[in-house]
């Protein structure tokens, strides 16, 4: 009666369904068991009525439970017990005991039963109806057992109980995490129970009379079970052994513990279950069968125990569908379980089947989970074991299988992690990583390079993250530049498709550009000779590239594309640079620039190292990789540094960007020297030439800082643009340089800061430029070289318009200075023309400075800048002179830039992690402001300089403290996290206690294991029962196989036909054509009583079609069998 009470408790949610189901099951069970009783002695005949009855009842059930059909698929694996749970299971139980075809029949039935089985799954929500079914089933089982308990007891104990317990199972799944284990173990156990039922069926027959006693014993049994329930509660993690006791007790216990232990025990059990599933299957097979045998033998309570044991089994099976519903794993589990059914010798191999069912479902569960884990890693939470397995599988199997996918996912994850800092960098990381992947396929070192690049990409992304953190306040400038960097990266990625070899350079050079300044330090002295070796340095850098895994493939790529484009440009430029460098060195300005260049690079390296310190380690690897292109640019940067020292124009935006604050005074002086020397123009020309390729790289940031500004304002020298056109043609190079700009962002961050100072210094620098201004000839030369730079800007712009985008923010800042410088340098008479253009261009640039965030805007503006500069080669030169007059307007623009950028720069500085270096830079900026102020006085433009001073000093003063404060806040946050960890430590102790409790449960399990001792004996009995069943099944299999062949009408029929051909050649033909053969065979169907088994198998297929068809195939089978016989 405990079932009734439990049913009452459980039936409360869906009593209507329970009533209907009860009616259906009662009618089906009552109607079917009669057929079963009739066929008990001859199991084959039982199968036939079962098929009919199952069709009827199953169809009615399916009609009743059509909605559950969706879960039927999930219920398929547990379809055997589900069929039993559906109430047809009693018949199926007999069928199971009868022959393996029962499983086929069960399949046939359980398609309908799937709905019914799914109904129990739905009943998982409606636990009562299932248990009501248990009660009803127990009653029909009592009836059936009265009729013939041999099979029904087994069925009731196994399948019937499975149905009843399936009812429990759904709640018990909720209440028991064990059910997943049980689902595996009980799945095997159910088959074993069935096998046990067959041998036990006689015992169960002996239990028939105890059945009544059992019902009376049920209260006492329930009492003992209640006692067990307590122990079981402790034993809930006890897995299958406890699960059997629990499940028996769970019938009573489930209502109270339906949902209580569920999640935790499910989680823990699911873990251990999946791990131990196979052993648990064995244990559960041993324990549960033994439990069942205990229920059969040790307990006359078999009705309850068997039913509850069946519940446990069904719990297991429903848990499988439940797990399938939860994990979507059940369908494969079910399918594999179905194959277990397909092995019509489930009784023979029931021990195997339990293992198969258990192993296959767990594997499917794990595989499915792993597969799900692959798509949804969050699924790992289903079970930590699955997490470990899925992780190992994902890392070992899925990564090998889908290395690219996992890598892409990992990179995506990395990108996502990067996303946390900033989406732009996330895009950069993703795009960079993906291009790396695209490149990696090209490179045979895909996987290592993937990981290396992954790591590099990761590290690169975090530096950018830091840069973002630093640039977040700068966001108007750096973020827009980051967005521009994104676009720039995207363009290189597009070119990754176009220039897979070139793009690696671009991306790698991007990173190299980041650390360019540090390497520039070394190359600063090298820059003199490096200009000559720029092309060679590409190769040398390639040799350096091996430092990173990508270096090797990149070496080839660097040598291939950059040397082609850059080498071509640089080859042409090298002679010029060589002559110019020689002239520069002869004039001794090189001596000044070397010192200046080296300190600048050092400062730049310091700033870069400070900002990129997070990035440099990965970036240094990339630097070494990218250095092939980056170093040539660095030689240029070295030259440009010299030129920077000579001209604060910020030709090499990289070094100038970083050091202009520190070097502004020498830069104007140096500018004066270059102006006086006229070779600065050549040097700048060499820069422009060398930098056309590398310029976009370093200047990518530098360009953002100075070069683009120059090119923008310099935009003169359409002829010098020709060499740039080559880089433009080698847009890959320009874009790679654009990518460097992206990676250089750390610098742009610095540059952003420097840009403020630069913006302010740019005015003084324009003032120093004004000083040399009288030297129009050198100015013109520089203008020409800047025109080359300008062409470089356009070339890089046209390919990497996005590059100007980022630089635009910085460019705008630097442009006023550049424009002023250029104006001072080129005081040509075309001022009137250039004024409008340069003023508008400068204003545009200034607007981008304030409005740097709109990358498209800035790029468009930058383009117009370069467009007028290009369109007016002479006019662009004139622009520069034009700027001489408008230089006042340019200072105004710079004022606007400083005013607009000052707050942004402040925010940037505050966020910049390397605020200390920035502090130094602001200091340098202040010095620049002063000297520039003097230069400005010389230029007659002290006001903008003063404004720049005030803005730069204020911004610089504000920057360091803000950065410090942020750092402190981070530290505080860490301390808080630590305190939380302290609480976690306490939590650790709590789990320890939980573990100890689990151990106690294990001790309870040991107690249960003592019970299992008797169960172990029972195990031997089921084993014998299995053997006996197997022998019977073998006989049935032979017949059923031929019949099954007719059922399959595919493989078995032809095979059987061949055999039949031997027996009777005439029938061989009908056999191959089962449909044709079936009709003539129909009359012969009657002779074989065994035909029903095959008929049941046929009906398994035919059940859906209809009873009449089932009978015909049966007759066909009978003929075939007769022929074979």
Swiss-Prot record:
Phosphothreonine found at: 260, 277, 349, 410, 447, 494, 503, 511, 658, 915
N-acetylalanine PTM sites in chain numbering: 2
Gene Ontology cellular-component terms listed: cytoplasm; microtubule; microtubule organizing center; mitotic spindle; postsynaptic density
Molecular function, one GO term: microtubule binding
Tissue occurrence: Testis, striated and cardiac muscle.
Ranges of the Tau/MAP repeats in the UniProt entry: 896-926, 965-995, 996-1026, 1027-1058
Name of protein: Microtubule-associated protein 4
Disulphide connectivity of cysteines: none
Biased composition regions of type Low complexity, renumbered to the chain: 254-265, 728-741, 761-774, 1093-1104
Species per Swiss-Prot/TrEMBL record: Mus musculus
Annotated Polar residues bias: 580-593, 676-706, 776-801, 825-849, 1115-1125
Function recorded in the entry: Non-neuronal microtubule-associated protein. Promotes microtubule assembly.
Phosphoserine PTM sites in chain numbering: 5, 60, 99, 254, 381, 475, 506, 512, 517, 519, 598, 617, 667, 684, 694, 760, 798, 826, 901, 914, 973, 1046, 1118, 1124
Biological process according to GO: cell division; establishment of spindle orientation; microtubule cytoskeleton organization; microtubule sliding; mitotic spindle organization
Compartments, as annotated in UniProt: Cytoplasm, Cytoskeleton; Cytoplasm, Cytoskeleton, Microtubule organizing center
PROSITE patterns given in the database record: TAU_MAP_1, TAU_MAP_2
Chief location of this protein within or outside the cell: cytoplasm
Pfam families: Tubulin-binding
InterPro entries for this protein: MAP2/MAP4/Tau (IPR027324), MAP_tubulin-bd_rpt (IPR001084)
């Amino acid at each position: 009666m405990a079932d009734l009470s439990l049913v009452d408790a459980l039936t409360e949610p869906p009593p209507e369904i329970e009533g209907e189901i009860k009616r259906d099951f009662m009618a089906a069970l009552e109607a079917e068991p009669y057929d079963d009783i009739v066929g008990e002695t001859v199991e084959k005949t039982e199968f036939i009525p079962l098929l009919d009855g199952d069709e009827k009842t199953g169809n009615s059930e399916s009609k009743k439970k059509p909605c559950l059909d969706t879960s039927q698929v999930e219920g398929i694996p547990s379809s055997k017990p589900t069929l039993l749970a559906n109430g047809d299971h009693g018949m199926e139980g007999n069928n199971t005991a009868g022959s393996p075809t029962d499983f086929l029949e069960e399949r046939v039935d359980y398609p309908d039963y799937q709905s019914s089985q799914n109904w129990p799954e739905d009943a998982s929500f409606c636990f009562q109806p299932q248990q009501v079914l248990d009660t009803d089933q127990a009653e029909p089982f009592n009836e059936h057992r009265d009729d013939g308990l041999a099979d029904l007891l087994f069925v009731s104990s196994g399948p019937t109980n499975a149905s009843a317990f399936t009812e429990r199972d759904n709640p018990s799944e909720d209440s028991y995490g064990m059910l997943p284990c049980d689902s595996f173990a009980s799945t095997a156990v159910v088959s074993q129970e069935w096998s046990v039922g067959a041998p036990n069926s006689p015992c169960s027959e002996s239990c028939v009379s105890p059945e009544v006693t059992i019902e009376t014993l049920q209260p006492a049994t329930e009492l003992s079970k209640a006692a067990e329930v307590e122990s079981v509660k402790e034993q809930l993690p006890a897995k299958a052994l406890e699960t059997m006791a629990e499940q028996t007790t769970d019938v009573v216990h489930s209502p109270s513990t339906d949902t209580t232990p569920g999640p935790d025990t499910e989680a823990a059990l699911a873990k251990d279950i999946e791990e131990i599933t196979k052993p648990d299957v064995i244990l559960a097979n041993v324990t549960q069968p033994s439990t069942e045998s205990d229920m059969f033998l040790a307990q006359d309570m078999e009705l309850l125990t068997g039913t509850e044991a069946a519940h446990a089994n069904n719990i297991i099976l429903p848990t499988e569908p439940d797990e399938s519903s939860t994990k979507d794993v059940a369908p494969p589990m079910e399918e594999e379980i179905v194959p277990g059914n397909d092995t019509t010798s489930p009784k023979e191999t029931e021990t195997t089947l339990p293992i198969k069912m258990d192993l296959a479902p767990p594997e499917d569960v794990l595989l499915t989970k792993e597969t799900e884990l692959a798509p949804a890693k969050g699924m790992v939470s289903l079970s930590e074991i699955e997490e470990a397995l899925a992780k190992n599988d994902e890392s070992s199997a899925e990564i090998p299988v889908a290395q690219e996918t996992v890598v892409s996912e990992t990179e995506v994850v990395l990108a996502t992690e990067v996303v946390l800092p900033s989406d732009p960098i996330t895009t950069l990381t993703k795009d960079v990583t993906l291009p790396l992947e695209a490149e990696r396929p090209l490179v045979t070192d895909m996987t290592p390079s993937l990981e290396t690049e992954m790591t590099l990409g990761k590290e690169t992304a975090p530096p950018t993250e830091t840069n973002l953190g630093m640039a977040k306040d700068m966001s108007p400038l750096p973020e827009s530049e980051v967005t521009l960097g994104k676009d720039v990266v995207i363009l290189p990625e597009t070119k990754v498709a176009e220039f897979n070899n070139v793009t690696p350079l671009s991306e790698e050079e991007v990173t190299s550009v980041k650390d360019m300044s540090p390497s520039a330090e070394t190359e600063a002295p090298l820059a003199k000779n490096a200009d000559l070796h720029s092309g060679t340095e590409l190769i040398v850098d390639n040799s350096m590239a091996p430092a990173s895994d990508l270096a090797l493939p990149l070496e080839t790529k660097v040598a291939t594309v950059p040397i082609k484009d850059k080498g071509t440009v640089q080859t042409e430029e090298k002679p010029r640079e060589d002559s110019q460098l020689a002239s520069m060195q002869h004039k001794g300005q090189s001596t000044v620039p070397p010192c200046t260049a080296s300190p600048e690079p050092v400062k730049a390296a310091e700033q870069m190292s400070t900002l990129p310190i997070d990035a440099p380690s990965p970036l240094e690897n990339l630097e070494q990789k990218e250095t092939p292109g980056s170093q040539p640019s660095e030689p240029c940067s070295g030259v440009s540094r010299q030129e920077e020292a000579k001209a604060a124009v910020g030709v090499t935006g990289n070094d100038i960007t970083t050091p202009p604050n520190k070097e502004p005074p020498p830069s104007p002086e140096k500018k004066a020297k270059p102006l006086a020397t006229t070779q600065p123009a050549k040097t700048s020309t060499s820069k422009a030439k060398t930098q056309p390729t590398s310029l976009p790289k370093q200047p990518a940031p530098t360009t953002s800082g100075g070069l683009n500004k120059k090119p923008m304002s310099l935009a003169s020298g359409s002829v010098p643009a020709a060499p740039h056109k080559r880089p433009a043609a080698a847009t890959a190079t320009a874009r790679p340089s654009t990518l460097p700009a992206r990676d250089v962002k750390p610098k742009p961050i610095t540059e952003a800061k420097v840009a403020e100072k630069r913006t302010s210094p740019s005015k003084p620098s324009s003032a120093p430029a004004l000083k040399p201004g009288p030297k129009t000839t050198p100015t013109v030369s520089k203008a020409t070289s800047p025109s080359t730079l300008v062409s470089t800007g356009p070339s890089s712009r046209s390919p990497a318009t996005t590059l100007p985008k980022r630089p635009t923010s910085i460019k705008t800042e630097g442009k006023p200075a550049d424009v002023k410088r250029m104006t001072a340098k080129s005081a040509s008479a075309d001022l009137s023309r250039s004024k409008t253009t340069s003023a508008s261009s400068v204003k545009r640039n200034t607007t981008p400075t304030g409005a740097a965030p709109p990358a498209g805007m800035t790029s468009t503006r930058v383009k117009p800048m370069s467009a007028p500069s290009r369109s007016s080669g002479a006019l662009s030169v004139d622009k520069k002179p034009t700027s001489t007059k408008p230089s006042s307007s340019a200072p105004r623009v710079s004022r606007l830039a400083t005013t607009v950028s000052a707050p942004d720069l402040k925010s940037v500085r505050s966020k910049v992690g390397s605020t200390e270096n920035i502090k130094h830079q602001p200091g340098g900026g202040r010095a620049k402001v002063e000297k520039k102020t003097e230069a400005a006085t010389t230029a007659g433009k002290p006001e903008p300089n003063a404004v720049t001073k005030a803005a730069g000093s204020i911004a610089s003063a504000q920057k360091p403290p803000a950065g410090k404060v942020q750092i402190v806040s981070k530290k505080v946050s860490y301390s808080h996290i630590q305190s939380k960890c302290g609480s976690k430590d306490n939590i650790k102790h709590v789990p320890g206690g939980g573990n100890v409790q689990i151990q106690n449960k294990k001790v309870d399990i040991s107690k249960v294991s003592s019970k299992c001792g008797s169960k172990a004996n029972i195990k031997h009995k089921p084993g014998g029962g299995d053997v006996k069943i197997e022998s019977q099944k073998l006989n049935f299999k032979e017949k059923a196989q031929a019949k099954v062949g007719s059922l399959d009408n595919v493989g078995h029929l032809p095979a059987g036909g061949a055999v039949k051909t031997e027996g009777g050649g005439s029938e061989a033909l009908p056999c191959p054509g089962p449909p044709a053969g079936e009709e003539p065979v129909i009359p012969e169907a009657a002779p074989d009583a065994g035909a029903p088994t095959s008929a049941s198998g046929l009906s398994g297929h035919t059940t859906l079609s209809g009873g009449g068809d089932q009978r015909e195939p049966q007759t066909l089978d009978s003929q075939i069998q007769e022929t074979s016989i």
